[in-house]
Structure formats: structure tokens, C-alpha cells
Amino acid sequence: MGVASIGKIMWLLGIIAWYAIRYPFERRARRSRVVSNRRSRSDFAGLASALFGMAVLPAFYVASGIPESADYPARLWAVILGAIIFGTALWLFRVSHKMLGRNWSITLEIREQHRLVSSGPYALVRHPMYTSFFLMAVGQAFLLSNWAVGLGGLIGFALLFFLRVDKEERMMLENFGPEYRDYMERTKRLIPYIY
């Protein structure tokens, strides 16, 4: 088995683990009452972009090897680094989900008895779940030795983040007021101490 195949298997295992983490929270979210809903076309466009760049395109590549013309030689160090980054992303994804609990939703929504979470990873960044997606996209770029698939994940994440984050923060400001403004002043959006 070659290094490229190991990278593909690691990516596939990571995606399976991601869904195993997400599924129980998805089920729970469906049972929780929504008080305010900010779904929009741009929200769905961001979700679709992330889904395409971080799941559909790489799954197609793993299954078919297409686009083969964008392949480059796989390196063991890159696959190991990609697995570490993807594993870190999964850990952060799980912790973020657990901290949010019933407050989480796949679209921009405020739940009944919604509370502001500002501990755990939320003490460092306002959007650790987006940070986990960013890390998954970076991990994908190292695991799958294909320029199109690597860039596809990063572009898919960037579209999701930049189409949603401002709207999400406006919604949180409207719901939590000064408490969220104070939280914004002491935390960064995505990368601790940087951005």
C-alpha cells in the first residue's frame, strides 16, 4: 500500500469519525424549539460550498482518483502531519459540540433557553467549531496529495466562514447584547490571539 492510499484511508476514517460525532447532536437539535431563525440563501450557499469542498470533491477523488492531473507525489511526513491536524480538528469539533450542547444548530438559529457559551475552547475563540473545520480543511490538503482537492477544502471552508460569521455574530449581539459584546472584546474569531 502506497503513501497516497494511506492518506486516502486516513481522510475517509476522519470523515466517518466526523459524522459519528455530529450525528447525535443533529438528532438532538431537531427536538429543540427554535426561537429565532436567520436562515438565508447565503447561509445555504456557505454550507453547500463546505459540503462540496470538504466532502463531495474529496470523496469523489478518493473513490475515482479524478482529477488525476492535479496529483502530486504523496509524502509520508505530509500524511502524518495531515492525520495529526485532522485528529486535532476532530477533538476540537467534539469538545465544541459538547460545550454547545442543545444550543447548536446547523443553520443560524437561536434555541429556546439559549445561553452564551464562553468556557472551554470558547474562552479562546468565538467560533471553535469553525476552527475545527479550518483544521479539517488543512488536514485534508496534507492527507490527499491533489492540488484541486486540497484547495477545494480550503475554499469550501473559507466560503462557509465568510458567508456566515458576520451574520452569526450580529444574531448573537441581538440576542445577548452587552454580554456578547464583552465576549467579542476578549476573544478572537477563529485563531487564538491572532484572528
Please annotate each region the language model reported.
Residues 1-112, 118, 136-195:
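Membrane-anchoring alpha-helices and their flanking helix-loop junctions
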Residues 119, 123-131:
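Histidine-centered phosphotransfer motif of kinases
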